[in-house]
Amino acid sequence: MKIRSLLVLLLSLWVAPFILAQQTPQSLADAELPSLIAIYKDVHSHPELSGYEERTSALVAKELRAAGCEVTEHLGKYQNSKYKAYGVVGVMKNGDGPTVLVRTDMDALPVNEETGLPYASKVVAKNDEGKDVHVMHACGHDTHIAAFIGTARALRKLKDQWHGTIVFVAQPAEEIGAGARALLKDGLYDRFGKPNFALGFHDKADVQTGHIAVTKAYASANVDSVDVTVRGIGGHGAYPHKTKDPVVLAAEIINAWQTIVSRQNNPLDPVVITVGSIHGGTKHNIIPDEVKMELTVRTYKPEVRERVLADIDRIAKGCAAAAGIPADLAPIVTVSKDFITAAMYNDPELTKRLVAVWKKALGNENVEIIDPVMGGEDFSEYHLPDHSIPSVNFHFGAVDAAKIAEFKKAGKELPTLHSSKFAPVPEPSIRTAIVGMTTAVLDLMKK
């Protein structure tokens, strides 16, 4: 019996290294999926609005500690004092080597969920104005969180394949474009080191599960919020000649702004100017004293952004002068400092390198190069304005291929991100995100 036991022990010692050597990002993702799906469903059922991610951040901190990270909680300095510091950083060290930042976002949206899922959100919370709103993970940040935790678990078990320091960043308030800046303002790079690379991911509502999609160079836009007050001289609607009508003037200004896009801008430099809100007046027969407008302005290049914002101001005031508005009643144009998101730039060389890694891990047919979008993403803050930190934010598909084909055949649009009906397929989405992120980190930190 003793000899037999000794043989079993020797055999187990001989086999163990080979078992460990067989661990891969794919096998570890598969092994962790059941518990990660449970986390995903829990987070999906308990969404929290931007700046109020108390429960979510505590859950992420707990999981990062369990994955072997040294965790710091309650990071973030906001301009808005209503928001508490719910940023979380987990540091995983493995000797000398490069530092790689891995980021997830955590916040949800004021959307009334209509997916019909058994774990659908029923949460109602107070928004910034104190009003009750339904809350939903309508942008897939719950899938990001689960994949983020899965990545930390996998990289802990693959420490023999990498060296250096991984800084896991769980960021609040992405949806309002404030979270990344709040963490950097709180000394993220001073306290945890400026990374050599920064990586992020996001689910995509029109790409099939199992696929990674990525954009080279500019991937998302500068986002500026502009408030404009068009002033006039009000009066009776029957006597417009005795007034300076700000309603007609506002209409002229809106049309003139579109010439910035069509006639004053290089068509190879995308620009979007959208007037999302216009309000003025109180009654049918009263010409008001002012009209208020709210704009969103989207650009890529910093020099284009500066010129377009200046043009918006110039045209508004020029139209007012042409309408005979006194100089002391010129339009007031204000670019918000609270809701600005910089354009996201995927470093071309790093993107090329990681595309090769993903094709090897997932197959050539499962990696797509996609066009940039005019949406905003505050992951852009991590590469800094001078793009001095090579960064890539990639997408993972979240929709079943059969569903994509079904909607295409019917000529219908799939539920988009931020839709009350958006429901990613969790298992393959989260698995692909883990494999994508883990293989990227391993390549950048390989021994």
Region spans (language model):
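Acidic/His- and Gly-rich active-site-bordering loop/insert found
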Residues: 22-137, 146-163
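Bacterial N-terminal signal peptides
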Residues: 8-18
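Metal-dependent amide/peptide-bond hydrolase catalytic core
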Residues: 248-447
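Soluble non-cytosolic domains of exported or imported proteins
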Residues: 30-34, 47-58, 142, 146, ...
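Histidine/acidic-residue-rich, glycine-tolerant segments that coordinate divalent metal ions
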Residues: 87, 124-136, 142-143, 155-277, ...
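Divalent metal-coordination and catalytic microenvironments
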Residues: 43, 64, 90, 102, ...
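Positively charged n-region of N-terminal signal peptides that target proteins for export
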Residues: 1-5
